[in-house]
């Protein structure tokens, strides 16, 4: 029997949303919270007071400058060089302090570096001792091997010379090998 399957098609419908643009997106739908309202009620008087004080200070400075300007004009040959000298002195003190602070921080860095390096020095010294001992052992073994090689070659040469010395018997015409070792 044939298996008949029916394929069902499903259709999904998505509702279209209207675009809410403009300034409404930036504000919450429910309105300001109680903390925001409290911040406005406290912040506006404090901000206004500080702004008023700043304005009064600016006005006082301008009025004081207008009143003092004739005195500055009269005493300018004395005031300008004095202000220049005071400015240079202050610059010198500030530069001296900055250089001193830089030197102090540099010394602190060097001391911390030495302190950190001092913690690793015993480990490095121990490692260097082991490497030096290994190298000395290696050099000793190589020297021993070289000495043994030289001794073996000298023995071979001595052996070759002892057996190569031939005694000629001229009457018989034969060569006799003579051992020249002394006992």
From Swiss-Prot:
Q: Where is this region: Hydrophobic?
A: 40-113
Question: What is its subcellular localisation?
Answer: Lipid droplet; Membrane
Q: Which UniProt keywords apply?
A: Lipid droplet, Membrane, Transmembrane, Transmembrane helix
Instruction: Name the InterPro entries for this protein.
Output: Oleosin
Region spans: Polar: 1-39
Offer one Pfam family short name for this entry: Oleosin
List the membrane topology term(s): Multi-pass membrane protein
GO cellular component, as recorded: membrane; monolayer-surrounded lipid storage body
Question: What exactly does this protein do?
Answer: May have a structural role to stabilize the lipid body during desiccation of the seed by preventing coalescence of the oil. Probably interacts with both lipid and phospholipid moieties of lipid bodies. May also provide recognition signals for specific lipase anchorage in lipolysis during seedling growth.
The entry's protein name is: Oleosin 5
